[in-house]
Amino acid sequence: MDGIHDLGGRAGLGPIKPESDEPVFHSDWERSVLTMFPAMALAGAFNLDQFRGAMEQIPPHDYLTSQYYEHWMHAMIHHGIEAGIFDSDELDRRTQYYMDHPDDTTPTRQDPQLVETISQLITHGADYRRPTDTEAAFAVGDKVIVRSDASPNTHTRRAGYVRGRVGEVVATHGAYVFPDTNALGAGESPEHLYTVRFSATELWGEPAAPNVVNHIDVFEPYLLPA
């Protein structure tokens, strides 16, 4: 969906101020949130694209003024309630309890196999390549244009700044889980994925350096012949 998360090419948001020597985690709660993500995914609360879609529904002001792992928390709360893992009243009760009793320890459960699975997911990620009998519509060297119509009301990887732009296919990667359907829980619907080369001037106009290119991975349904 279109929203404040899609910031590529947008101006007027002020300077970017990177934090020097930024730590991996700013607080211990961020460590917990990181491990909660694969644990809840393995419990069936969401898939990766549903998770991203929930973050994209955060109101713009809240999105820009909250921390990275707060976005994750929002998505996990949203899907945890939808999946019936907990309800909002239970979450409020537990939150209030630990606000009133900050020195109390949280319950623990030992599951070495789950810990190992989560460790592997965090370290190596998951493979989203899928087999398909469908032939690729495009080949290396083809000129393509990214569809310029508005984003559907779901998570998509078709960034705003690339819509309507013409590029050249420089690599084909086979089929991968299609985010737009996967985010709706409507199936993985594997689609061919391509790397498309765009000139910087095609993407950004005359201010861009004429000898610079951008390589962007684009799913087949986002593309039309140029």
Curated annotation (Swiss-Prot):
What is the induction note for this entry? Answer: By cobalt and urea or cyclohexanecarboxamide.
Q: Name one GO molecular function term.
A: transition metal ion binding
Q: Which reaction does it catalyse?
A: an aliphatic primary amide = an aliphatic nitrile + H2O
Report the biotech usage: Industrial production of acrylamide is now being developed using some of these enzymes.
Question: Could you tell me which residues belong to the region Disordered?
Answer: 1-22
Keyword Lyase in record: yes
Q: Which Pfam families does this entry report, sorted A to Z?
A: NHase_beta_C (PF02211), NHase_beta_N (PF21006)
| Keyword annotations of the record | Lyase
> EC number(s) on record?
4.2.1.84
Alphabetized InterPro entries for the sequence: CN_hydtase_beta-like_N, CN_hydtase_beta_C, CN_hydtase_beta_dom_C, Elect_transpt_acc-like_dom_sf, Nitrile_hydratase_bsu
Q: Does the keyword Hydrolase apply?
A: no
NCBIfam families for this protein:
nitrile_beta
- Give the record's subunit note: Heterodimer of an alpha and a beta chain.
Job description of the protein: NHase catalyzes the hydration of various nitrile compounds to the corresponding amides.
Q: Which family does it belong to?
A: Belongs to the nitrile hydratase subunit beta family.
Name-wise, this protein is: Low-molecular weight cobalt-containing nitrile hydratase subunit beta
Q: State the organism named in the record.
A: Rhodococcus rhodochrous
